[in-house]
Amino acid sequence: MPEVSSGGGCGACGRRHGADASCPTLVRADVRAGGTAHPRCAPVVEAQDPLVGVRCGSFRLVRRLGRGGMGAVYLGEHVSIGSRVAVKVLHAHLTMYPELVQRFHAEARAVNLIGHENIVSIFDMDATPPRPYLIMEFLDGAPLSAWVGTPLAAGAVVSVLSQVCDALQAAHARGIVHRDLKPDNIFLVRRNGNAPFVKVLDFGIAKLADAHMPQTHAGIIVGTPEYMAPEQSLGRGVDGRADLYALGVIAYQLLTGRLPFNDEGLAAQLVAHQLRPPPPPSSVYPAVSAALEHVILRALAKKPEDRYASIAAFRNALQVALAEHVRVSARKTRPGGLAVLERAPVAPDMPTEGQSRGRLGVDARAGHVPSSLASTSQRRLAPAAPAVPRASLVEVPVQVVLRPGESPVRLRGSGLSRGGLFLHGGRVLPPLCSRLPVVLELASGPLSVMCEVVRVVPPAQARVWGMPTGFGVQFVEATAVLKAAVDALLQGEPVRAVPQVPLTEDPAVARLLEAWRQRSAGDAYAVLALEPDSDMGTVRLRTREAWRSLESLEQHSLTPPQRAQVDALRVRVREAAEALGATVQRALYDAWRGNHRGVAKCLEAGLTAEQLESLRREFLARRPQAMGTARSHFQSGGALERDGQLSQALDQYERGLKLAPLEVDMLQRYRRLRRVLGGRATAPTGHDRARSP
């Protein structure tokens, strides 16, 4: 979803093109059936985006990053802790189509099923009206489409496509076909090392190939025609070989600088892919070797059975063809030249403002076509890569509180930079996007910093990548002292030691921290010392008291482990305040815990019927079995109430509300019956701390 440029553009895709040109909107009426696209191209009025500043869950939309056929993507910032995500919002005019709203569910489900590091992560979603959205990881980089239009180096192309193949192989192994692969949906991000790291995006029209799912409506074409396999545009069944065909088109485009078919218009593109053989890549760009040409043309075979049997086979063929390409090129190049030209690609530079910008977060800087992707004919011999600074190879011992309330554990840190480091040597891996207090044990003394987990490498992935099991963190609140110490280490300079006064634990502080540790082991109510039926005013009061308590602790002389514990407690209090501090978030939090008394307090504090109904649908979608059992209790309670057995009826209502606490009618009936009984209630069970409202 590239950024919409100023001026007129297509209302569906946000791009400028003629009225008859093919529009990359994901849903089109089948021109073979005489249909028209919906919506048809219309001018885009450039104005202040009405969604900027709007809150989606815990995130506020800061600015729009890109716009595409199904929706727009915004930079989102957490309202309390400032963490950044990408928020994908469905276009308002498309919310009337249930099949498109369903694709938001499908995208989140598909990505969750696959769980591969080369696929963009989706953290949360809300498919309820009026604004369905997805919460995704924020990527710093640019789409592959930023570099199409000129032939690129074979080594760089194969490196990128191999990572795409890895992602698709994981998807196909779970029966998921992407169905809309194109350079816009392949994102290159910055990672440590030289090679661009690939993220595959937009599984919104992915389909479970072997599931009993409703087929696409008759007369509707789903995908992008320039990259669509013949069987897909003809409405036949598709499998992973349709994705393989799209990768063949992308490989053709990257190596030659143009698409295999340049026909204008949706119908012309579809017919070309269905009937016409593509021109040999070497006829477009002679530098394409015969080996690579053979692989591409086989991937572009009209019949699926004539292509490679799997993405893995295609990946292997690319690697073999690249090796042959290097050998052939070496015979045509003076000794030593190619060894430099064909080295592993480096991290991509950002495109200029005139080029397509990354939709999931791009730090766009003035630059040029990256040396990693430029064709060998466009580059000169490059000097050898500079040696890695000695400090970056030195492991830094750290202490980390991995779970709230626990003591810090010692880990090893590597890959140190001003932005963060990679931690390994432990058995527990924290969740992605969680915040952890970290103490760097430097020669100058311990330095404490709050970090956010941005990458998790479990054992299986660690074996594949030849790296230790661990997790990467970025510094969230790095001080000037920390930055200076890291800079000194990276430059190989000794860090000037600061005299340290040995600290002993204050018994009073130790007792307070132990009390806090016990509180933090519970739920949000326990962290803030609240009863489950506390009103919103009490929640805010206890939140302020918790912050003051932690601030007073920080005034003491704390040992590094104690300071790490306080940092972890601050994270825990912040999480509890976010869960209980607003009526909508608290009502959903209470629903998951069966706390109907808390839901009642949210209604008293102004939770609207529309908000409650939206939460109810989300709750039942995730716990569809809950309502059946709850309804049985509600019916039993109704029968007992009619029979005059009010105490027993109240008990049945209570049991039902613990399973389905967002049923407003039953909440009202329960509270009315309590009043009839004069405030008497059934005794709470041992695990229910809730008091009678």
UniProtKB/Swiss-Prot annotation:
It comes from the Bacteria. Residues 59-328 form the Protein kinase domain. It is an enzyme of class 2 (transferase). ATP binds at residues 65-73, 88. TPR repeats lie at residues 630-663. May be regulated by calcium or a calmodulin-like protein. Its EC number is 2.7.11.1. Keywords: ATP-binding, Kinase, Nucleotide-binding, Phosphoprotein, Serine/threonine-protein kinase, TPR repeat, Transferase. The keyword Hydrolase does not apply. Plays an essential role in proper timing of early development events. Residues 393-491 form the PilZ domain. Disulfide bonds: none annotated. GO terms for molecular function: ATP binding; cyclic-di-GMP binding; protein serine kinase activity; protein serine/threonine kinase activity. This is Serine/threonine-protein kinase Pkn1. It comes from Myxococcus xanthus. SMART domains: S_TKc (SM00220). Autophosphorylated. It catalyses: L-seryl-[protein] + ATP = O-phospho-L-seryl-[protein] + ADP + H(+); L-threonyl-[protein] + ATP = O-phospho-L-threonyl-[protein] + ADP + H(+). Signal peptide: none annotated. The active site is at residue 180. The keyword Transport does not apply. Belongs to the protein kinase superfamily. Ser/Thr protein kinase family. InterPro entries: Kinase-like_dom_sf (IPR011009), PilZ_domain (IPR009875), Prot_kinase_dom (IPR000719), Protein_kinase_ATP_BS (IPR017441), Ser/Thr_kinase_AS (IPR008271), TPR_rpt (IPR019734).
